[in-house]
Amino acid sequence: MKIADIELGEKPLLLAPMEDVTDPSFRYMCKRFGADVVYTEFISSDGLIRDAAKSLKKLEIDDAERPVGIQLYGHLVEPMVEAARMAEAAGPDIIDINFGCPVKKIAGRGAGSGMMRDVPLMVEMTRRIVEAVGKPVTVKTRLGWDDESKNIEEIALRLQDVGIAALTIHGRTRAQMYRGEADWTLIGQVKNNPRIHIPIIGNGDVDSGPKAAEMFDRYGVDGVMIGRATYGRPWIFREVKHYLATGEVLPQPSVCERVEIAKEHLRKSLEIKGEYVGILEMRRHLSNYFKGLPDFKPTRLKLVTLLDIPELFATLDSIAERWGDFDVSGTVPEPLSHDL
């Protein structure tokens, strides 16, 4: 599979852009475990233009992440075009447009999946961004606004016609949010439309090698994007790649292995963000590495409250000492929430 001139190989796996999750240190970890493409957290076009510090911070990328995409969202054409130019200046490999976020404060303003109710505006915004930047432009969206308006087949063709380099489709409508099961049937129909010539990437509920294999084999997608299943589990990319290559399901990493992974992740966060912010922004990740351990609540509380770096590393070491022999086979982390 290729996105424009970016060669990704056969059956690539992509890390979904997720707010408050896919920060630089987490992207680094997912890349280390085999993600072929990673994406930033979504970035507000309005925030970039008004020089909002949080939005500008999200533009920071590292060469070790490549290929990496910067994802933007907004509801007005001109600010989105300007934001795309600013994002391109940060040096990503891909500019991605978010037409899929279902959260009310985003979609209710007409951005994210709210754009699916105004297809002409969606198409015009995309066309203008494609014309404004030199990097490949991709789109992530959903099946439609609700069950009565599943218009992804029309949208895919129209976005292809204005020059996008690839399309990622999440197998739910906006009305579903993240409820129920993702429906890949329409994703497969888009992919198998003879008029479609751009890569189609499927997204939704892929949390194992067998599920990824089914999506490739049954629906013919060019790539699979993994989102919530990466929470506390960046090694899922290694698991899936191993299964696709061998048909073998890898055992879950032991508690001791998870401790070493968490320590590496923490060190990377400290390196990138400094001590204070690096610790604060790791809290959402650290405890999730150890979901399912018995009597873990007091230790979890330490992981999400400590500010002393040596004490934090010592707490991680204590997890290996206390739970090192615990059977982790049934402790695959559950998604943190359904509102990303």
PLM region descriptions:
Residues 1-340:
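Flavin-dependent oxidoreductase catalytic cores
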